[in-house]
UniProtKB/Swiss-Prot annotation:
Keyword Ribonucleoprotein: yes
Family listed: Belongs to the universal ribosomal protein uS14 family. Zinc-binding uS14 subfamily.
The keyword Lyase appears for this protein: no
Cofactor binding description: Binds 1 zinc ion per subunit.
Keyword line: Metal-binding, Ribonucleoprotein, Ribosomal protein, RNA-binding, rRNA-binding, Zinc
Listed Pfam families: Ribosomal_S14
GO cellular component: cytoplasm; small ribosomal subunit
GO molecular function, one term: structural constituent of ribosome
Cofactors, names only: Zn(2+)
The protein, known as: Small ribosomal subunit protein uS14
Native organism: Anaeromyxobacter dehalogenans (strain 2CP-C)
Subunit record text: Part of the 30S ribosomal subunit. Contacts proteins S3 and S10.
Amino acid sequence: MAKLSKMAQATRKLKFPVRQYNRCPLCGRPRAFLRKFQMCRICFRKRALQGEITGVIKSSW
């Protein structure tokens, strides 16, 4: 329940733009947020391995 309220709070327009922080829209995780893909690292990895993100391939060397 707390995560839902934090997600709702993150979507509101704040009085000062500095106070805004990024939160994953899929799971609500506030940390390890990738700005380029607008999701957290865990959701990014899950979707990249499933092939849902275009242009992302698994690295091997």
